[in-house]
From Swiss-Prot:
Residues 76-95 are annotated as: Disordered. Protein S19 forms a complex with S13 that binds strongly to the 16S ribosomal RNA. InterPro entries: Ribosomal_uS19 (IPR002222), Ribosomal_uS19_bac-type (IPR005732), Ribosomal_uS19_CS (IPR020934), Ribosomal_uS19_SF (IPR023575). GO terms for cellular component: cytoplasm; small ribosomal subunit. Belongs to the universal ribosomal protein uS19 family. This is Small ribosomal subunit protein uS19. Disulfide bonds: none annotated. Residues 80-95 have a biased composition (Basic residues). GO terms for biological process: ribosomal small subunit assembly; translation. It comes from the Bacteria. One of its GO terms (molecular function) is rRNA binding. The lineage of its organism: Bacteria, Bacillati, Chloroflexota, Chloroflexia, Herpetosiphonales. PROSITE patterns: RIBOSOMAL_S19.
Amino acid sequence: MSRSTKKGPFVDVRLLSRVETMNRGNEKRPLKTWSRDSTIFPQMVGHTIAVHDGRRHVPVYITENMVGHKLGEFAPTRTFRGHGGKKADKRGKLK
């Protein structure tokens, strides 16, 4: 279910203020954030934001296509290591 339109999109105030100060100063350095639920705003385009995935910060370069999405969508939290082990090998050998 999406967020109510009367509430507007959520963005961490501290993150947005840091992006705006970097825009005023023409800086382009990575910003570390734990706010995965923040919506990407047009002011963030062109910046690299290091989003925390639970273990480390994943650098995400923000493009125009990402505006309106959440930061957490671009930093996966789970790593898929494949299905099965010995069972999968045995099934393949029997056929």
